[in-house]
Swiss-Prot record:
The gene is rpsC. GO terms for molecular function: mRNA binding; rRNA binding; structural constituent of ribosome. Binds the lower part of the 30S subunit head. Binds mRNA in the 70S ribosome, positioning it for translation. Disulfide bonds: none annotated. One of its GO terms (biological process) is translation. This is Small ribosomal subunit protein uS3. Part of the 30S ribosomal subunit. Forms a tight complex with proteins S10 and S14.
Amino acid sequence: MGQKVNPVGLRVGVIRDWDSKWYAGKKDYADLLHEDIAIREHVEGRLKDASVSKVEIERAANRVNITISTAKPGMVIGKGGSEVEALRKSLNELTGKRVHINISEIKQADLDAKLVAENIARQLENRISFRRAMKQAIQRTMRAGAKGIKTQVSGRLGGADIARAEHYSEGTVPLHTLRADIDYGTAEADTTYGKIGVKIWVYRGEVLPTKGTNKEEGGN
């Protein structure tokens, strides 16, 4: 089952945290969930070239706190904070609530699966060979300190008549190990032959349990 399920969702509550942190009753839950989706689509659409990895949302009363994780914080903030202020105003109008935006910088973009996937997708759109794009991405990620990476592209590769999927990997990616810090990201490339899907798994090492389990391990 570990081969099929989303590796991030499988680890939520174990070593990963939720991207949306709020509570709502049955009456409001669906509306707030759709609002979260609209916020993420708006942010990702507006900051398409800013290497945005994820958008975290927290709610308190009539206030929405949004944390944008990006490899290019300067592009998100803009000159004198103009871009982030324009984004905040547009989100205020979209939600009808007070919106506060935090920017979190991603120090190593090559270890972020979403950004690696987007990088490959952009190269495919620029007619670079999918094999070359994947192998270069693998080299950069392993050089950045990853323990393993698995890549997959699927669609009409190289303009072929029949769609297929191709995989490349290096190192280990233990999908069944819950303490393994595995990042997963997807992207789509719009080519002249149609869409090509990109999936990336990056294994960044094990996250050790934080609660006192050493005694139990020593006892065994």
